[in-house]
Design a protein with these regions (language model features):
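Juxtamembrane membrane-water interface segments of multi-pass membrane proteins
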Residues: 1-15, 33-42, 59-80, 95-105, ...
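Hydrophobic cores of alpha-helical transmembrane segments in multi-pass integral membrane proteins
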Residues: 16-33, 44-64, 80-96, 130-145
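Membrane-interface interhelical loops and short amphipathic "cap" helices
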Residues: 32-48, 104-120
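Calycin-type beta-barrel ligand-binding domains and close structural analogs
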Residues: 99-102, 106-109, 125-132
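Individual transmembrane alpha-helices with interfacial aromatic-anchor signatures
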Residues: 115-136
Length: 159
C-alpha cells in the first residue's frame, strides 16, 4: 500500500475512534436525562445504546490503529460510514423517550408503556435502525475478514 493510502486508513481510523469516544460521552451525559423523560425505560435503552455501541466503535478503531491488518481504504470507509450512521439511530432512540414508538423496539416499548408514535416517528425509528444495523454488520464483517486474512497469511488462525 502507498503512504497516502496508509495515511488515509490511519486518519479514517482516528475518525472512527473519535466517533466511538463521543458516542460514549453522549451516552454518559444522556444518563442524567433518563429519569426526566415521559418514557424513562426507552431513555434508558438510548443510554445503553450510546454507550455500548460507542465501546464497540472504540474497539474497532483501536484494532485498526494498533494491530497489523489487511483492511483496505474502502473497508475503512464502510466502517467510518457505519460510525456516522450510528448517530441518527441513537439520537432517534433518545427522541423516542418522548415519542413512545412501538414498532421498531416492541419489547422495550411494551415495558415502557408506550402507545405508539406518529407515522413519521415510527418511520424514522425503522430507517435509522435498519441503516445503522446493516452498516454495523457490514463493517464488523469486513474487520473480521481482514484479521482472518492476516491470520491465514501467517499460516494459523491464531495469528
Amino acid at each position: 500500500m502507498s503512504t497516502n493510502t496508509l495515511m488515509s486508513i490511519h486518519d479514517r481510523s482516528r475518525h472512527i475512534l473519535i466517533h466511538g469516544l463521543m458516542l460514549v460521552m453522549v451516552g454518559l451525559l444522556w444518563g442524567f436525562v433518563v429519569p426526566h423523560t415521559p418514557h424513562p425505560r426507552l431513555a434508558l435503552g438510548a443510554h445503553i445504546q450510546f454507550v455500548s455501541v460507542g465501546i464497540v466503535i472504540v474497539m474497532m478503531a483501536v484494532l485498526l490503529l494498533k494491530l497489523p491488518h489487511h483492511v483496505g481504504p474502502k473497508s475503512v470507509g464502510v466502517m467510518l460510514t457505519a460510525a456516522w450512521l450510528i448517530w441518527p439511530m441513537a439520537l432517534s432512540e433518545a427522541a423516542n423517550a418522548w415519542w413512545g414508538t412501538t414498532q421498531m423496539l416492541p419489547i422495550a416499548a411494551g415495558q415502557a408503556g408506550a402507545t405508539g408514535g406518529a407515522v413519521w416517528q415510527e418511520v424514522v425509528m425503522k430507517v435509522t435502525h435498519v441503516a445503522a444495523g446493516l452498516a454495523l454488520v457490514a463493517a464488523w464483517g469486513l474487520l473480521v475478514s481482514a484479521f482472518l486474512k492476516k491470520s491465514a497469511a501467517a499460516g494459523t488462525l491464531n495469528g
